[in-house]
């Protein structure tokens, strides 16, 4: 059975580090602060907002919420972004996306209105460019691929000279994860829906980051002994036993039992990457405050 790369251990270490750093900032009179912009009241947004607020309180980050009605206009949203851009007490901003359907055509313009130094979840073009250029002090990488890197770092998984495969090419996970693995000196291949020999490519990898978003798409045919699997996806498996004794629970891309029986290490779903992302968001806010 593979070693489980548990997100809780990574999160606990991150939180302890952040508590020390926020205390040091507060001694200097700097209160690291996250601004949350939400248009409407989507249940998943509200759930994430609640979790983020709780995590912020734990590590010493303040939260300021900017709630707009579901029918807010482009001008309404831009006005709020201008407000947080001008507020020096706000160091990082999270805006829930996707925006409501009537703002879909304007989402690109709205996202890029945010000051890149406050873009803690990579929603501006400048932050995306920073990921491809190696970041430095230009914005922040998306929280999910950053969480993948935190897991690799925490468990001492050296990427240098390793073959890494990323399944998925989205701007949210796949592409930035590939760039970040390159930054760790891995040799990276991206597989996607048009790749014809994904299983063969994956078997030759040392590290697999799966962000396909397809239940049971990563099977025993894709893996071999010695590999590390980072399963990013959140899927619904109607046949998976749940905590209430019934069926229906979240799962990743990996057909977990058969893959875990072969590879050396794997992140579970739930309890893996997803549990680390909120602490990564707080880390980005703290880093933004330290840069300010």
Language model regions located:
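Short beta-strand segments enriched in small/hydrophobic residues
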Residues: 31-40
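Glycine-rich phosphate/diphosphate-binding loop of Rossmann-like nucleotide-binding domains
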Residues: 39-53, 136-232, 237-240, 247-260
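Positively charged, low-complexity intrinsically disordered leader regions
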Residues: 1-30
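Short beta-strand segments
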Residues: 38, 94-98, 167
